Amino acid sequence: MTRTYDAYGNVISQKSRSFRQDGYDRRYAWNASGRLQNVIDGITGGRTTYAYDAVGSLMSACYEDGTDDYRMPDAVGNVFRSRDRRDREYGKGGRILRDRHYDYLYDVEGNLILKTPRRGLTQHPNHEVSEESGTHIAWQTGDYAYEWYGNGMLKEVRLPYGKTVRFEYDALGRRTAKLFNGHVFRYLWDGNVMVQEWHYEEKDRPQHSIDEFGRIRMQGEEPVENLVTWVYEEGSYIPVAKLQNGERYTIISDYMGRPVEAYNSYGNVVWQADYDVYGDLRNIKGIRDFIPFRQLGQYEDDETRLYYNRFRYYDPRIGNYISQDPIRLAGNNPTLYGYVGDLNNWADVFGLRCKKVKKIGPSIPEFHRKNFTDGIVNMRQVSGDEIFYKYHGKSNRLGREYNYVTNKKYLSEQALREDLALLKEWGVKIEYVTTFKPQAGTWIGEGTAAKQISQDGTEILEGTGYQGIINIKELPNSTIIKTEKVKFSL
C-alpha cells in the first residue's frame, strides 16, 4: 500500500498491488478547509463527489453511477435522507421518531425499544412508552424489539421474523458473547481492540456456578472452534490481517482506517466494499461479514445490521445511535443520538466522543511551497532504496529543518542552476554534494522547481526540474553515504 500527500498533509492518492496486479486505486481532492471533495477510482475512472453545509457537516454524495445520496442536516444536527428534509421526524435530543418505513418508540431512559412499520401507536410527543404507564407496545411480526440492561447496554434484539439475538459484556463494556440461532459467538479483547473470535453450538456451552466464596466457576472447558484472529496496525484500531484456518487474509483500509479490500495469500480479492454517507456498505463483493469492521471502532452484526460501537450501537440505515450518548453533550456529537458531522474526517471510536481521525502526512510551510511550480508539493514516504543528492556550499547546510534535494547528479553547474532555478543573486555557491539514502518511511515532498526571476529582471530561470524537500536534520547519520567536492565535467 502506498499513499501520497499534498503539502497540507491530505492524502491525494492511495494504491495497493498484489502479485504485480493493480488493486485498490483511489485519487482524492480536498477543498481549502480540508474536506474531501471527490474521489476518483483509478481503475474504472468513476468519480464520487461530496458536498457540505456551511459548518462543514457532510450533507450529500453523488456516486460514480450518478445517483445522489442525501444526509441533509438541519440547524441542530438531525439528518435527513431527502433534500427537502421532509422524510423524517425527530424528537428531543435528536431521537428519530418516524421515517418513511418505521415508527421508533423509546423507554423513559431514551433507549430505542421498538422499531415498527405500524403507525400511530403512541401519542407521546417523544414516542416514550413504558409498562409502568400502561403504554407498552408488544412486538409483532415485522417489528424490531430492543431490550436493555440496567447499565444502558443492549441486551437483546427480537428480529422481524421472531428470532432473538442476545448479547453479553464484561465489566468494561466490551462485548464477550453474542447468542443467535443456537450458536454462541465469543470475543476476546486486548485492551480496546478485539483480537479473536470464535463460535460453537449453544448446547456445548459450559454452565457456570457460584461457589461458597462468591467466585464464578465454569463447569468444563469451553469449545474453541472456527477461531479467527485479527491483527491491527500497531497502536491503532485499524485491522490489517485476518487469520483463519491456516490462511492469512490481508486487509486494505482507506485513509480513514475503514476496510475496503481483503486478499487471500494468492493475491485474489475475497472481499471489497465502499461506504455511503452514513457509513453503510456499497458495492459489496464477497460475503458481507467476512470483514465486519466499518468506521473506526465499529463491528457490524449481520443479524441486526447494527454496528457495535463499544458503549452504543449505531444504525447505518438511519445515521443515528439507538441510545443516547452516555456522556451527553460532552461527546461533542451533533445530537445526543447523532454520529459525527463529517464521516470523511471524523469517527467516534467508543460511541462516546467524536474526534478527527483522518490520516495525514506532514505539511510544508507556505514559504517553501512557493518554490515549487504552482505551489504543488506531493508528500510521500520513500521506499528505502532511493538515492538523493544535496548540492551545497562549505557551510554544509544539512542542519536546516528543510533541505532541497534532487534525484540525480548533474554534469554541469549551469544545468543544475537552470533545472532548479537557482538565481545568481542568491549568492548560493555550489561546492559540495552530499549523497544519502533515507530509511524506508522517511517523508519527502516532491514537485518541480518554480520559475524564478531576479529582482532587476535580468535573470529568468524556468526551473521545472525535479525538486524534493526533506528534513535531513532528523535523518540518522547512517543515511548519509558521503559528502564530496563537486566535480562538474561540463
Can you say where each PLM-predicted feature lies in the sequence?
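A motif-centric feature for acidic-aromatic and gly/ser/thr-rich catalytic loops and repeats
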Residues: 26, 74-75, 85-92, 245-310, ...
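Short, low-complexity export/processing leader segments characterized by acidic and small residues
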Residues: 262, 280-282, 312-322, 326-327, ...
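Catalytic toxin/effector domains delivered as secreted proteins or via bacterial secretion systems
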Residues: 354-490
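Intrinsically disordered, low-complexity Ser/Thr- and acidic-rich flexible linkers and loops
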Residues: 19-25, 118-143, 203-222
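A residue-level detector for well-ordered beta-strand positions
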Residues: 3, 28, 50, 71, ...
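Surface-exposed extracellular loop regions of Gram-negative outer-membrane beta-barrel proteins
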Residues: 25-36, 42, 47-56, 112-118, ...
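Beta-turn initiation residues at beta-strand->coil junctions
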Residues: 1-7, 13-20, 38-44, 60-66, ...
